């Protein structure tokens, strides 16, 4: 398998193609495009930019299917670190991981079938159906996960050469890399331990209702025990609102808060934070976690 440069699809024999080029629909501008062939699959990497920001679209294509995940630009370095972990660790040291980025959660799950080992990467968010790509480990040290990692490294490096207009630096602490069961630590990042109540992983995310349209793209997600809470700014024919969605397993419920009540809501939440701060000091969220292996 080889890596190449260009714009469009992959060439025979596993070539990866690089180039800046068109192809972005609407207001999206394509900055970098690469293609990688792993076994019978083609993977397309497209770094794009629009007025809402920059993102990396990774698509997996086989003869019968195509699936896509969308990675925020702030998550490219985390994907690179995670693939480094899977490439460089011994097989018995590999664990499934979970990465939280803004309003999205990405799951990295190790599996094996008759063709060999693979890494399943799934994207889940409150505004998009769950999507999954499956990356074979490869039959030699420079194939599969390693080739995928190398392309992520090239895109990460190239991304730094493009200056985004009105670029806003992510707030400190928005992405953290930790393990919550000890094993599978990824070198080069903090090893802060989250509370034990965060060990269980919920994996089903429902899509929002059709009546809640006009989402602005300003979203956040937090974790508490076995639940996730999604905060999404949006608007409809009644005006602007903040939708707060609670997701636990397959259960999902939402409340819609008009912006006119947001300040009062903030004051009430602040009141309860103040009177309970002695109880919640030291509780921190985890953006990348090790997932307990299934019982066999």
Swiss-Prot record:
One of this protein's Pfam families, by short name? PurA
Start and end residues of each stretch annotated as Disordered:
1-25, 186-214
MF-aspect GO terms: mRNA binding; purine-rich negative regulatory element binding; RNA polymerase II transcription regulatory region sequence-specific DNA binding
Q: Which residues carry this modification: N-acetylmethionine?
A: 1
Q: Does the keyword S-adenosyl-L-methionine apply?
A: no
Cite the entry's keywords alphabetically: Acetylation, DNA-binding, Nucleus, Phosphoprotein, Transcription, Transcription regulation
User: Where is the protein localized?
Assistant: Nucleus
Chain positions with Phosphoserine modification? 207
Major location, coarse class?
Answer: nucleus
> Could you give the subunit structure recorded for this chain?
Homodimer. Interacts with TCP20.
* Protein name as annotated: Transcription factor Pur-alpha 1
Q: Which gene encodes it?
A: PURA1
